[in-house]
């Protein structure tokens, strides 16, 4: 799909990998009769989500100089994502993840990264011109786990911020990748006060606050003065939003979920694409609620197919879905 050249650029930083998804839901990895190869990785999913919706996006990260790595770069290009920020590592493989799909479409992960190419991105390999051209710079926390990628992440954030980009953060907690829960929490929170938009899931809210109450009081313990929008996604219960001046909830759409992979990324991509050229939406509750309803629809549609990227909807698909609701 051709990207809209007039739109502001959304640059997504981090990992892209291959998810191996069982062909049968509700079985363990050992019992799975076969696996479907599905490209994924939250930051890459967000970049493709933006492009599918008619926006402009670029991906910054490192892939293995192997068949899987070149396949993933090709998928980004095919989906209209700028690939000038991609590096290839000749010494490390592209990351793999085996995903267990429970009967309700939710997931558990087993990762193969020892180390994978994405972990080896160095600050001197960053395409700084591309990063400086971002109107929105989006990232997760997996790139904070080890050096040198952590330093590359911090440098990219700093360069984007100095150039005037809006910083967007989705921690995308994957506990098995961290040395410990304490380290995960420390590192996720180490860059917390830099982001102007933060999206967490209900599970991440519980993890970061230590509270099992998913309510406004708990969510607002994560508020910081630089924030423009804090979002808590509640899966089949919709989402909650918090700004400096207002807060509220947006109802979900009920669909037959088969795989929740990529739903949060689809939600984030939709949100960023709607605000990249008009940040005033963040200060207008009525308009923000419309944007979040659209984002909820994107997330819901994404759960109705297996794999993240194949399931990310186009703008026309979302509008058609909303017309029927």
Curated annotation (Swiss-Prot):
Pathway: Glycan biosynthesis; starch biosynthesis. One of its GO terms (cellular component) is cytosol. Pfam families: PfkB. Keywords: ATP-binding, Carbohydrate metabolism, Kinase, Nucleotide-binding, Transferase. It catalyses: D-fructose + ATP = D-fructose 6-phosphate + ADP + H(+). GO terms for biological process: fructose metabolic process; starch biosynthetic process. One of its GO terms (molecular function) is fructokinase activity. Its EC number is 2.7.1.4. It is an enzyme of class 2 (transferase). Belongs to the carbohydrate kinase PfkB family. May play an important role in maintaining the flux of carbon towards starch formation. This is Probable fructokinase-1. It comes from Arabidopsis thaliana.
């Amino acid at each position: 799909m051709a990207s809209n050249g007039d739109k502001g650029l959304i640059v997504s930083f981090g990992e892209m990998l291959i998810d191996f998804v069982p062909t049968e839901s509700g079985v363990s990895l050992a019992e799975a009769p076969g696996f479907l190869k599905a490209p994924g990785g939250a930051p890459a999913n967000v970049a493709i989500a933006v492009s599918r919706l008619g926006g402009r996006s670029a991906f910054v990260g490192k892939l293995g100089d192997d068949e899987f790595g070149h396949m993933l770069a090709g998928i980004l290009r095919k989906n209209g994502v700028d690939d000038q920020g991609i590096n290839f590592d000749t010494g490390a493989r592209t990351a793999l993840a085996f995903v267990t799909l429970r009967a309700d479409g939710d997931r558990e992960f087993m990762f193969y990264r020892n180390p994978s190419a994405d972990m080896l991105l160095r600050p001197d390999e960053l395409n700084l011109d591309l990063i400086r051209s971002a109107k929105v710079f989006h990232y997760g926390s997996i790139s904070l786990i080890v050096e040198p990628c952590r330093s590359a992440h911090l440098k990219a954030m700093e360069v984007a911020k100095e150039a005037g980009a809006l910083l967007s953060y989705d921690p995308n907690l994957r506990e098995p990748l961290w040395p410990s829960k304490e380290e995960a929490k420390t590192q996720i929170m180490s860059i917390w006060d830099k982001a102007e938009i933060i999206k967490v899931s209900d599970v991440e809210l519980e993890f970061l606050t230590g509270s099992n109450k998913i309510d406004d009081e708990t969510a607002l313990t994560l508020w910081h003065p630089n924030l423009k929008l804090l979002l808590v996604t509640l899966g089949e219960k919709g989402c909650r939003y918090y700004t400096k001046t207002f807060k509220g909830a947006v109802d979900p759409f009920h669909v037959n979920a088969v795989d929740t992979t990529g739903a949060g990324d689809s939600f984030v991509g939709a949100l960023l694409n709607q605000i990249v050229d008009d940040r005033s939406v963040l200060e207008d509750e009525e308009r923000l609620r419309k944007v979040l309803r659209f984002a909820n629809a994107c997330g819901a549609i994404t759960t109705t197919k297996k794999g993240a990227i194949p399931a990310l909807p186009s703008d026309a698909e979302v509008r058609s879905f909303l017309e029927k609701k």
